[in-house]
Amino acid sequence: MSRRRRAEKRQVLPDPKFGDLVVTKFMNYVMYEGKKAVAENIIYGAFDILEAKRKDQGPLETFHSALDNVAPAIEVRSRRVGGATYQVPVEVRPDRRRALAIRWLVTAARKRGENTMTEKLAGELLDASNNRGTAVKKREDTHKMAEANRAFSHYRW
């Protein structure tokens, strides 16, 4: 642990189109090398595709439902006890839940087979909002791992 004081959390401004802080966080995860305009075009393009594909729901609702479906409730953390390392299941804090969900969505989108990042992101968001896709599978695997190591839950922090 650092001996200095804890770093302050920086305030993020809401995105210009929807006025949503979570969309801005998502934009920052998509962004490479400080190119925010490129990340903005990718996300808004993906939202346009979502709007065309899902008439029953707006792109922002689809985005938030995708995030909710990917966010893990429980994860495992390594804990050393007497020479053995146990994978101890712990609940995930709300801010980490959102960060993991965003990270998994972006990673899964980058690995998809479509041509442009806009199409990849739209496809992954659509899949995640329908409870399928790589990001949702990652969440399921995390939950399975926690369930398998439930016997070590008494080693909590």
UniProtKB/Swiss-Prot annotation:
Disulfide bonds: none annotated. GO terms for biological process: translation. Keywords: Ribonucleoprotein, Ribosomal protein, RNA-binding, rRNA-binding, tRNA-binding. Pfam families: Ribosomal_S7. The keyword rRNA-binding applies. HAMAP family: Ribosomal_uS7_B (MF_00480_B). Part of the 30S ribosomal subunit. Contacts proteins S9 and S11. This is Small ribosomal subunit protein uS7.
